[in-house]
């Protein structure tokens, strides 16, 4: 069992801010004037009504995937968001070429040590998306542990990006790490159909199967599960489940989602890995709204789906207006242009509760 301790090996501090008071007897008056305590981090000293999010995801200079899809929407919803970029690429890899760097586990830990050294590790939420190696995922688990040492009430929202439509984007050995180590410590999971099947070892061929997959995941750890897309007999569904306590059955619901005839930007890692900017956005919206409606996951999902669908429709409309074929183009989502739909979505999709 891991014990809570300072990541840098120094003595842990009793509060969020270290005492930087300097004895007046040890310094001259002129020197005392030049030595001042660091100003407080206002997002810590004066926290918002929403929270403070650490988001560990990919990043591209151009385009909207990973943190580029998640940070701005969460900020619009009132959150302070600190991004750590697991990769930094010039653009998504659907282009003829790309340049950039991949963060390794030690580099991630260096950043955590830097935050800890200045007592900046207090977060209300951790958000993770695409992770490309077992070593990096194991280091993320250490980050989860350390953040919960600082804030035991930390909410960990995990998008277990592994694959889609029967194909893995990541090394196969990541699946067991997600199933055995990550799921038990997550507060909310947002897998797609294929990822839910991998995590539960259950083939999802019906709504009943989707609900049972949520139950299996609840039994392992997370209180909230949203399977963001399930294709059943030509219909696309979102199935959500909230187990408020272990003594009662979870509250479950579905939202029917229209199919949009377009291929939105997916980010490839290595040969097979795809990371959808729309999926990253959806998980961020679910985090944002579920925190505002902590006991109404169905309401949070309605708002998230309504925002996302409005954004996708705007993206399609803008590309068509510019003369592009939405059937054949790899589209970049119109995130900035859709900020009103993110901040104040028109509720166009309703959840149907299972009884």
Where are these regions (language model features)?
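Short acidic, glycine-rich surface-loop motifs adjacent to enzyme active sites
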Residues: 122-133, 159
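Conserved phosphate/ATP/ADP-binding segment of small-molecule kinases
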Residues: 168-272, 293-298
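A short helix->loop->beta-strand "cap" motif at the edges of active sites that frequently abuts
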Residues: 147-156, 220-223
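Short Gly/Thr/Asp-enriched flexible loops that form oxyanion-binding sites at enzyme active sites
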Residues: 135-146, 236-238
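Short glycine/serine- and small hydrophobic-enriched flexible loop segments
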Residues: 284-292, 306, 310
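Glycine-rich, highly charged phosphate/nucleotide-binding loops
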Residues: 100-116
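Charged C-terminal helix
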Residues: 37-42, 298-355
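Glycine-rich phosphate/adenosyl-contacting loop at the front of the ribokinase-like
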Residues: 2-103, 342-355
């Amino acid at each position: 069992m891991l014990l809570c301790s300072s990541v840098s090996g120094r003595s842990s501090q009793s509060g969020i801010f270290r005492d930087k008071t300097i004895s007046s007897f040890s310094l001259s008056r002129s020197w005392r004037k030049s030595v001042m305590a660091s100003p407080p981090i206002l997002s810590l000293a004066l926290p918002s009504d929403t929270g403070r999010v650490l988001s560990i995801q990919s990043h591209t200079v151009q385009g909207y995937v990973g943190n580029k899809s998640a940070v701005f929407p969460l900020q619009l919803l009132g959150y302070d968001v600190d991004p750590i970029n697991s990769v930094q690429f010039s653009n998504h890899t659907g282009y003829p070429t790309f340049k950039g760097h991949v963060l390794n586990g030690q580099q991630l830990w260096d950043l955590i040590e830097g935050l800890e050294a200045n007592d900046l590790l207090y977060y209300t939420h951790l958000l993770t998306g695409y992770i490309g190696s077992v070593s990096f995922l194991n280091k993320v688990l250490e980050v989860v542990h350390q953040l919960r040492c600082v804030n035991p009430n930390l909410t960990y929202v995990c998008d277990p990006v592994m694959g889609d439509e029967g194909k893995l984007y990541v090394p196969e050995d990541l699946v067991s790490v997600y199933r055995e180590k990550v799921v038990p410590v997550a507060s909310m999971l947002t897998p797609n159909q294929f990822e839910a099947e991998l995590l539960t070892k259950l083939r999802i061929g019906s709504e009943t199967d989707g609900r049972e997959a949520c139950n299996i995941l609840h039994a392992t750890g997370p209180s909230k599960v949203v399977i963001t897309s399930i294709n059943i007999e030509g219909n696309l569904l979102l199935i959500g489940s909230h187990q408020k306590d272990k003594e009662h059955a979870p509250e479950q619901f579905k939202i029917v989602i229209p199919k949009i005839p377009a291929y939105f930007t997916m980010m490839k890692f290595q040969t097979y890995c795809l990371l959808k900017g729309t999926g990253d956005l959806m998980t961020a919206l679910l985090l944002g709204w579920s925190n505002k409606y902590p006991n109404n996951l169905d309401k949070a999902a309605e708002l998230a789906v309504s925002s996302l669908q409005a954004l996708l429709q705007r993206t399609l409309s803008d590309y068509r207006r510019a003369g592009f074929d939405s059937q054949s183009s790899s589209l970049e989502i119109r995130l900035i242009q859709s900020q009103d739909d993110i901040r104040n979505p028109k509720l166009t999709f309703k959840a149907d509760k299972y009884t």
